[in-house]
Structure formats: C-alpha cells, structure tokens
Amino acid sequence: MDAYALPTYFPLAYSELQFLASRRAAAVAAAATVLPGSPCINQHHPTDVSSSVTVPSIIPTGGTSDSIKTSIQPQICNENTLLGNAGHQHNHQPQHVHNINVTGQPHDFHPAYRIPGYMEQLYSLQRTNSASSFHDPYVNCASAFHLAGLGLGSADFLGSRGLSSLGELHNAAVAAAAAGSLASTDFHFSVDGNRRLGSPRPPGGSIRASISRKRALSSSPYSDSFDINSMIRFSPNSLATIMNGSRGSSAASGSYGHISATALNPMSHVHSTRLQQIQAHLLRASAGLLNPMTPQQVAASGFSIGHMPTSASLRVNDVHPNLSDSHIQITTSPTVTKDVSQVPAAAFSLKNLDDAREKKGPFKDVVPEQPSSTSGGVAQVEADSASSQLSDRCYNNVVNNITGIPGDVKVNSRLDEYINCGSISIPSNEYDCANADTTDIKDEPGDFIETNCHWRSCRIEFITQDELVKHINNDHIQTNKKAFVCRWEDCTRGEKPFKAQYMLVVHMRRHTGEKPHKCTFEGCFKAYSRLENLKTHLRSHTGEKPYTCEYPGCSKAFSNASDRAKHQNRTHSNEKPYICKAPGCTKRYTDPSSLRKHVKTVHGAEFYANKKHKGLPLNDANSRLQQNNSRHNLQEHNIDSSPCSEDSHLGKMLGTSSPSIKSESDISSSNHHLVNGVRASDSLLTYSPDDLAENLNLDDGWNCDDDVDVADLPIVLRAMVNIGNGNASASTIGGSVLARQRFRGRLQTKGINSSTIMLCNIPESNRTFGISELNQRITELKMEPGTDAEIKIPKLPNTTIGGYTEDPLQNQTSFRNTVSNKQGTVSGSIQGQFRRDSQNSTASTYYGSMQSRRSSQSSQVSSIPTMRPNPSCNSTASFYDPISPGCSRRSSQMSNGANCNSFTSTSGLPVLNKESNKSLNACINKPNIGVQGVGIYNSSLPPPPSSHLIATNLKRLQRKDSEYHNFTSGRFSVPSYMHSLHIKNNKPVGENEFDKAIASNARRQTDPVPNINLDPLTNISRFSTTPHSFDINVGKTNNIASSINKDNLRKDLFTVSIKADMAMTSDQHPNERINLDEVEELILPDEMLQYLNLVKDDTNHLEKEHQAVPVGSNVSETIASNHYREQSNIYYTNKQILTPPSNVDIQPNTTKFTVQDKFAMTAVGGSFSQRELSTLAVPNEHGHAKCESFHHQSQKYMNTDIGSKQQSALPSAHQRQTEKSNYNQIIDSSMTSLPELNVDSIYPRNETENIFKVHGDHDNEIQCGIISQSQMSPSTNLNNDGQFSTVNMQPITTSKLFPPEPQKIVCDTQASNTSVMHLDTYQRTLEYVQSCQNWMETNNTSTNQIQSLPGMPVNNTLFPDVSSSTHPYHGTNMVINDMTTSLTSLLEENRYLQMMQ
C-alpha cells in the first residue's frame, strides 16, 4: 500500500489532510527564524499574546531575498516574532535540528490552528506506518507537527515531485520570509493582497498593537498566506468547510453570510483570477501533488482538487486563464485515463446532455451529468435529494460518448466545467453522511447545466453557467421590473407573472440548473435550488426535528412537515387527502411525497413537470371547495395535492393535516349533539334540522353555497358566534342549519387543536385553528351587520309551541322567529346557567366546557346577539361595539339572559331557588296550531345595553322608597316582553309575599350560578308541582289562603309544563336587573333629572291612593305585545283582574277565554328583570306607587263561557288603524322598554265569542315613575288644568257574558310635576320619540292566531323585547330599550341642551 493510502473507514481524513498540508505550507513559507544557538523551545516573546505554539521555520542559505535558493530546514521555535515583527531582521540558524524531544501538550498550536483531536490517532498511524517512503523530520516532535506526515522539507519528497526546493513552488513566499516582511509588496499574498483584513499591520509593532482595533486581526503566524475566511470556516462542525470550495454563486451568494461565491478557486473566474486565490488553491492542492492517490483518496478529495498534473512541476506561471497549454488528466479510476487534449471540443459546448440526446442518437442513454459548482476548478456533486446519480456517469457521458459529437472551439474554455465530472468516483456508502437525508424535498429540478440562453428572442451562448445566470438576471429580469414573467422557451408556467422579482429568480433555476444552496457538511454533496429545501436537508445533519406530531399524547417529532403529515395520516387517521389528478387515476395517498413519487413513476416525468397531475381538489365529500378556487386558496387550505410549487413562497412545507381528530359523522345531525354527555336526541326533540332548510330560498346576502354548515364548525366557534354554546346545547340544532354564516375561507386558520369536533367532511379542515386568526375572524363577525333574508318558511305543524304558523305578509322578518319556533322546545341556552363561563371570550374559549367565575354571563351571552343575526335567537342582531357596556364581564345576573331563547322560555319570571323558571307549555304534535313569529328584528340595531355600569349611580333616587321592598332596594329594569298570565285576587294588601319571597332568594352578583342538569325529567321536579298549568292569581283583597306562606310560595309560585323531549333553559336579557339608580348622570339631562326628582316627591301620596283602590273579584285581562297583535285562545281563571295587583297565586284552571289587546310592558318596579318574563303578577305598590298620574279605573270584568272554545279573529290592519283605543298606561321607573298597557278594541267575527271592547274619552298616556331616559311619549297630552284626563274603560259584553261591576278611580296630579321641565326640551324629546315610533310603524306586522289545545293551558305567551330606543315599537310610551343607543343619543341631547341654556 502506498504511504498515503488511508483507511477507507475514515473517508474525510484525506480531505482534511489536504487542508492541514496547506496550512503547513503556509506556515513554512511565512515562518521566521529564532535567535542563533537556541532551540527556542517553550520561549515567549515579551509581546506575544498567543499561547506557546511551535512551528517549523525556513532557514535560508543565501543573503539576498530575491535570489534565495533554499531547501526546507525544519526548525522548532516559538511564535515570538513571526507575525507582528514586520521589519525586524532575523538571524537564521544554519543547522538541521533532529530528534529534539518536545514534551508540549497536543495543543501546542494556537487554538485556531490546532489539529482536531479525532485526527491525532490517524496521524499517529501514519507516523508509525512502516510503508512510509519518506522520513519525517518531526518524528520525535509533538503530534501537532505531524501534519499527516507531509514534511514539505523532505528532499526525497521534493525530488520525487520534481521540485528542488520550496522556492520553486513560490519564490515570492521564500523571499518574503527572508526579508521578514509579510507586508512586502513582493509577497502577493500578504494582508494587502486582497484587503480581506481591515488594515495593514504597523511596520514595527507586535500583534498586541492590533488588539484595540475595531476589526480583530488574526493571531496566526501564517494567516496572511492564504484565505483567512477559508481558515475560519474550516471546522468539522462548521456549515462551510474549505474543501467544498465555493458554495455560493453570483446569483445567490448571500444565502449564507460566510459563503463566498468566488473564494479559493482559480478556475471560477479565470478572466479575473486573484493571486491570493491562486496561492491558497496551490497550497491547499499541494497535498495532492505530493504523492499519487488511490481511487478512494480521489473520491474523498475530488471535490477539492480538480486537476492533478503528474509530470511537470506546477509553477505559479502555469496557472493561466486559458488552460489550452496544460495537459490535464481526468482520472476516475486507475484504469480509465484519457487526455483531455484529445477530446473533441464539442463535448463541452453542449448546453446540456439533453440537447445532446436530441442531436445525436448515441446519446439516448446518456444521463445528465452531475453539475459542477459555480467554481469550476472545485468539482462538486450536486445531488438531488430525490435522485442519486452516480458521479462516474458524468465522466462516461462526457468522455466515452464524445467522439461522435461535431467539433467546437470551446473545449478549453469549457474544460473547467466538465473536467470535474471525471475526477469524481462513485461515492460509496462509507462516504455517505452519518444521518441519511430521507426527506423528499419538494420541487427540486433535476441535475443539469445550462449555458445557452433560451429566453424569447435571445440565443446567446455562454461559457459558464454563472455567466448565463448573470445574463438572465441583468438583461432579462432587471430590465423588466413591471412584470415578472418567465419567457423561457417551453416553460410550463405559461408566462404567468410572479408577484416578486425573487420568485422569478428562483424559478429561473429550473431552466439554468443552478443550485446555489449546497450542503456545507463534510462529505455531503447535495445542493438545492431553494434555500428552504437546503434548510430542511440540514436538519438531517443537525438532528433538528421541529415538526412534532399534533395528535394528543404522541411525542414523535420530524424534521419536515411532509414526514409529520405522513405519520399523522398513517398512524392516527385513515385519511388519504392527497389525490392524483391524472385522468382516470384514482390513487390517493396519505402524504404528498407518496403522491409525487406516484406521479413521477406511473405517469412520467413529463407529466410531472407539466403539472398535469395538479388540479383543484375534487368536489366530493372529502373536499367542499369549489372548482373555481385558485391555487393560492389551496395553499391556504393546506391541500398539498400538488407536489410542485411554482413560487418560492408556496414552496414552504406546511403541516398539511391535523389528524388528531378523525372524521366523524355529520355533526349537523341532532343525534350528534351531546349535552353534558347525553345525546340531544335522547332528551330533546328528535327532528331533522334539514326539514326547515330544504325549502329555503336564500338571497345573495346568505351565500350558503360556498359556506360551511354552521353545525360543522367547532364547538368553540359556535359558542362565539351565537350558534350554540360550548356544550353544544340543543338550541343549536334547529337554528344552526339555517345560519350558514359567511365562514368558509375566513375560518380556515390553524393553531388551535380542537380535540372534539372539526369540519368533518373536509380533509383540509383536519387542522387547527390559530388563536390570533380566530380572534380576528370572530371580531370580523362581530362587526358585520346582519342580513335580512327574505325566506320562504314552510309550515311546521307538529314541531313548535302551539304549532306556530307563518304570516305570509311577514316573510322578511319572520325568518328568525320561525327558526325559533322550529327549535321550540329545545331552544333556550344553557349559557344562562353558567354564570362565569368564558365561552364568549377570545382567550379562554379553547376549553369551552371549563367554567370560570371570572367571566360573566354577559361575556358569553350578552354579546352573542351583537355578533351575527342569529335566526334562532329572540334578540337584536347588530353591529358589535367591543367596548360597549353590553359586553361587560363584570355584569352579573343582569347579563345572564342568552338571546337564544325562543318562544318556549318564560325567563321573565323572577328567579327562585337560583334557578331559571321555565314555562314550556308547548303543544307539540298538534296540527293546525300556529302563531305569528314574534321576533321582528332589524339587523342593524345596536347591541344590548350595559350591565354593571348601571349598577350604582341612581340609588339615592330610590332611598325614599325603602318601605317598599324591592329586590335590592333599588330600581331595576323591566322585562321587554311579557307572558299572558292570569291573575287571581286573593292576597292581602300589605303582605307583599311575592316580593319577599323573591328578595329572600336574591343572590349577590358574584355568586356563581349552579349548573342545571339538562335532563328535563330531573329539572321538572325543581320547578313544577302542578304541570300543565301556569295561572297566577293576584289581588288586593284580604282573603288570602292561610295555607300559602313564603316557603310554599317559593315552591309553588311557578309551575312549569315540561315534557321529556323539551330542553329546559333559561335565557335572560343582558339588561336584566339593571339598577337604574346608578346611571342617572350618564343618560339624563339635568332638566329631566330635576323633573323626575320632583315627580318622585309625590310617590307617597300616589301610593295611598292606589292602596285605597277596590278591586273586583272577577276580572279578565289579556296581555298582548304592542309590537304585534295576536288573537289567542288561552286558559284563565274565573277571577282575573285587569289592574296590576300585588300578590300572586297559582291555581289550575280550565276556563277558556278569548281576548285581544295591546300590552307592551307592565309596571313591575324592581321585581322583574329586563329579559325575564314579566306579568301582571306584581305588587300593587310597585305597579302604582311610582305612578304620579295613573288613572286607575275599575274595570268591568266578566266571566266567559267555560265551554267556549271558539276563536276570535283579528281585525284588518285598516280597521285597527281607524279604531279608537284608549291606553291605560302603567309605566315603571325602569331604564329600558318603558311600557304601556294598551287595551285595543277588537271586533268579533262571531257573536258567540267572548269579546270586550274598551272605550275611552281621550287618547291619553300617563307619564309615570322616575323616568331614566329623556324620551317622552308623543301621545302624552298635558291638560291646561294640570291634570290628566280620566280614562274610562267600559266592557262590551254579549249575552253570554256576566254583568260586570264597574269601578272607577281617578288620580289627579298637579301640573307642577311636569312644569319644571322646559317645554322646548320636552318638545325635542317628544319629536324624537315620535320619529322613532313612525319608523316602527312602517315595520308593523300582522297578527296570527293562537289556538290552544284542550287540557293544555298556554298562558306563557312571549312578547318580543324592545330592541332599541331609536327603533321603538309603535304606540309605545317611552321606548328605552338599548343602553348603547340610549347613552349615545341622550348624551348628545344633553350636550345640546346645555348649549341651549
């Protein structure tokens, strides 16, 4: 074996030896001698700042520096004056020193130049090798001196190389060494040679003098003799090593800052070769000149030595830009040797071997050669990750098949491009990287070299690939910056423009074959055209695995997203989302790499290159994207069905799936809604929501074709957009299928890994939703206005309460109402029971089922109607104000009401036992029962009013009413819709049992509400003791049953009719229980406050009058909404009263009664909440104590025929407009929805029907209570005598009616109560309210009938809530519904009033 043959198990040894040899040569050329007679072992110069480093020295034999003929004489010395003492004269020691024992440590060299520890064993093997053909003069020296046994001073070695001395290798180096000046102008490789270092060293200083400089100078004794950057980069752990030469190109040399495009190689740019590059190259290549190399050595060092002259000595002047004078031998194996000079020049003139195959038949089997690096002298193997071409094929293609190619003149100039192919052997397995790169890099072109420009109308031919790249960048790309279009011939992109210039530059590498991004690890020859592909490849060396499996509990990590997707789809899922788009091919794969391989192998490379396999995802069950989606949308959806990407920004490998959640059956089905672990179908109504949606005709505003079904959205999103709550309550079943929100594409984000429900049937949806993007989308949804869709609603005879039917005249506004009817008994949100859930906040909604006391129900409920116009909610859809008080997280019970409640909830009742009382007296499965949908909304209305902000400011206005027991001794808002409750007069006047029972159970605002079990059978026992009846008997008499006490009252106050298939939820309006005493300064003008305070002073007087009012024992009353008119058949008791009483009782009754009247709101004082159902069952003190000018009239009451079940018809709209109706106003001191009790005269269709008509002398409204808004009713008539006119209500009875007992009471009020308020202020307010009422009259709706069933009382008719003070219901007195709008309008009015004063 040759002395320089290294073991094959150490493939990198020889390449490192080359570099070490070059360092040794540089050290020899630059070393200075020490003082005579001194071995200079371990001596330190006073100015030396480095460690004790022993280096060899050159001992000259002559005296002149320009004609030195010297042999290499090794000398052991210190690094005292080698680098910094420029200009010092050194004495040379003339003797040859042998056998000097050096006891220094292996780190005798400076740390920057120490030999790697893992190579010391190899060097020791070389020194002890008996087959050495030369004598190592440093055999007894430290291991740092044995640079792989390459003693350049050996006369035997130099003689065998044809070099008499090292001076012939480079005369200037020896001359400079003798002169002692490293900065000499004769030494072309000094610090001034290329200005790589910051500045020349001082002429007489030491290295310490340069410490204070801004740019650190090297402390090496021989760093100036070769490329300093190459030295710095050399390290086994470095990303760029010296043996790889240039790892960059002129087009992309900046991908790594330490990679120079033209470093070290004299062949890279022969027209501008720099001497320092030549010197460094020669010194580095000297190891290859010393001894012949075996094929293994050639394989290991081929990438650093491109040419190896064997006969003549290589001098500096041999390096010529034109290599035609050189006879360079290509050696790929010991048996294959050809002279390049004998090769026809046409072999190197072809643009690539593909052209050669087209032009010449013998090249059919020629494989494109492995390209060299952009530096031609340093051969490089650019291996594509998807292909492993053998490097010797390049030689065979270029050399063996070259004889038949026509001649060309570019053989010598192209030699530096193709000569490298022959010097590379097959990289065997032992030379492979330790960490094999198994990554299937995406979108990497094959390996070829293009030198001719095929741009349209351009046929320029270039010598090198670099020149072509420069030409394309400068002449084609830079000159046309308006449109970045590839006009390369036969480009499959079809001149589709790029968005940025860099994308076009990257794309052009497909045509030129340029791969500037090369792996910088030792022994790895892979190169890539895209930097991201190189970064992915580098992870195979570094072991970095940033892509972790997203499946819960799986801890596997991967270096690229493709492997992770493969793992997830194969291991945790059965999905195969990557579909081959080839015609007739039905293959599907779990990962994109498998699809790419399939396309390449089955359909061919051309099919793959032309991207014919690409296509939009199939419009099937696994992909609901439309066919007209763009490719960019595919990237947004992370559908990697296309293995190639055109743009660099599309080439990034993203996680293509989130298979942590497998596809389940359609979530929109009601059977899949789990309510606290119980299927909704087990306890709720079992109907298909598609029944309602199948016949809908949606306009353009509801773009459902390209939207995701709301039921398919994750639970978190449904909770946020009011489609349902975080527990997937049954309220989402009916409404969600119609609420096809505009989600698709906007919610296709990533980041949150929902482990329960994803978009089931969409493969690209199996990924996560990002918190930030999700918050942004939710905010957009909140800010969107609603859409009034004109929808045809089919009749639903058997699925709703009372079988509500549709009014054909109100298609536009009955959409949401019908939806609410559709989900009747399953409506209502559980959110009202989760007081502190954070299900509507954007930060804590990831765990929707985890309850938090810190987020109020206002967060989860009150802002729900502000997000989207949800048809399933009895609320107002509007713009969302993120800082509106309606979304206050601290609002407690007043914000508990979820707006998802439909006709089945009776949440207006006071909360007893901390439970929401529900009256779901729904009549299901009964035909011919219908009612007009009551939720008439305007989608642009603002959100609900404030909650906690209203809680403390106006208490002082109510202090004088302490004798009247309110819930919390304050004034609270009144519900905005009512139940038709029938009242019985059998309570004593002074007991106020109703209030006391409720007040005793009032909880503080910070107490959490216990969760309610959704099992209706369990909940029935909580609320109802007498099912199927809901009759409240209230009176002012003293004959109350002794069996009724407070405890029994709490238990028996409300009876709830519930069936097993009904969901029991309680939804409360966010304005509920608003303390009006806390917001007076915010919303009331000063004059209004003065007026109200004066009016309040007469409270005690009025109360006495009201308490003296006798009330008959039999009264009949109906409560209807002022927003709509309806005719209903309801059950009532024999004793019912039209006047608001003070006590409540519950008695079952089977008497039927038919009524029609208008009622907007009762005076309930502090007893009721905003959204809870209000009744006339309120204390008389609360109903009348605050009324200053209430004309209490005794009513003619009557009893209807018990057996009468006939229906009463509604008068036409014209009849109602021409009708004379009298208003009996009972106005509470509530902040929102100040009501009026309007009894409208109804004309009977049938004479046998029980109809009563109310007559009056005046159309008057009585202003009552301490009003919290500045709007005054337009119908208020102030009399000159300071009194309000008396309203006389007289019944009209038929022969079947019992004769009533009339009673009349007139309450007179002094005019001074209202005279304090300026007339202009009142007039402006009046005009404002009138304009609002006029606006609402245009939206007036007709009335449907309410027909009850025998044996099933329906007494809990819901009335719609007044949504805004700017959009009041027609005929109302003072519509103050929405704090958001009220605050805005009244503050502006207050400013105007102050300016007018």
Curated annotation (Swiss-Prot):
Gene Ontology CC terms, in alphabetical order: cytosol; Hedgehog signaling complex; nucleoplasm; nucleus; protein-containing complex
UniProt-recorded Gene Ontology molecular function terms: cAMP response element binding protein binding; DNA binding; DNA-binding transcription activator activity, RNA polymerase II-specific; DNA-binding transcription factor activity, RNA polymerase II-specific; identical protein binding; protein homodimerization activity; protein kinase binding; RNA polymerase II cis-regulatory region sequence-specific DNA binding
Pfam families hit by this protein: zf-C2H2, zf-C2H2_15
UniProt keyword list: Activator, Developmental protein, DNA-binding, Metal-binding, Nucleus, Phosphoprotein, Repeat, Repressor, Segmentation polarity protein, Transcription, Transcription regulation, Ubl conjugation, Zinc, Zinc-finger
Listed GO biological process terms: compound eye morphogenesis; cuticle pattern formation; dendrite morphogenesis; genital disc anterior/posterior pattern formation; heart formation; labial disc development; mucosal immune response; negative regulation of hippo signaling
Post-translational modification: Polyubiquitinated by RDX in the presence of CUL3, which results in proteasomal degradation. Phosphorylated on multiple sites by protein kinase A (PKA) and phosphorylation by PKA primes further phosphorylation by CK1 and GSK3. Phosphorylation is essential for its proteolytic processing. cos recruits multiple kinases to promote efficient phosphorylation of ci while Hh signaling inhibits phosphorylation by restricting the accessibility of ci to the kinases. Phosphorylation by CkIalpha and dco enhances binding to Slmb, the F-box recognition component of the SCF(slmb) E3 ubiquitin-protein ligase required for ci processing.
Biased composition (Low complexity): 657-669, 849-863
Region ranges (Disordered): 193-212, 361-383, 636-669, 807-877
Zinc finger regions, C2H2-type: 451-476, 484-511, 517-541, 547-572, 578-603
Stretch list, region Interaction with RDX: 1-440, 1161-1397
Gene inactivation effect: RNAi-mediated knockdown severely reduces adult survival following the ingestion of E.carotovora. Abolishes Cad99C-dependent formation of endosomes and DUOX-dependent up-regulation of reactive oxygen species (ROS) in the intestines of adults fed bacteria-derived uracil.
Biased composition (Polar residues): 807-832, 839-848
Subcellular location, record wording: Nucleus
Principal cellular location given in the protein's record: nucleus
InterPro entries recorded: GLI-like (IPR043359), Znf-C2H2_ZIC1-5/GLI1-3-like (IPR056436), Znf_C2H2_sf (IPR036236), Znf_C2H2_type (IPR013087)
Subunit (UniProt): Interacts with RDX. Interacts with cos. Interacts with slmb; the interaction is enhanced by phosphorylation by CkIalpha and dco.
Family: Belongs to the GLI C2H2-type zinc-finger protein family.
Reported function: Has a dual function as a transcriptional activator and a repressor of the hedgehog (Hh) pathway. The full-length ci form (ciFL), acts as an activator (ciA) while ciR, its C-terminally truncated form, acts as a repressor. Involved in segment polarity. Required for the normal development of the posterior half of each embryonic segment. Engrailed protein directly represses ci expression in posterior compartment cells.
Listed name of the protein: Transcriptional activator cubitus interruptus
Name of the coding gene: ci
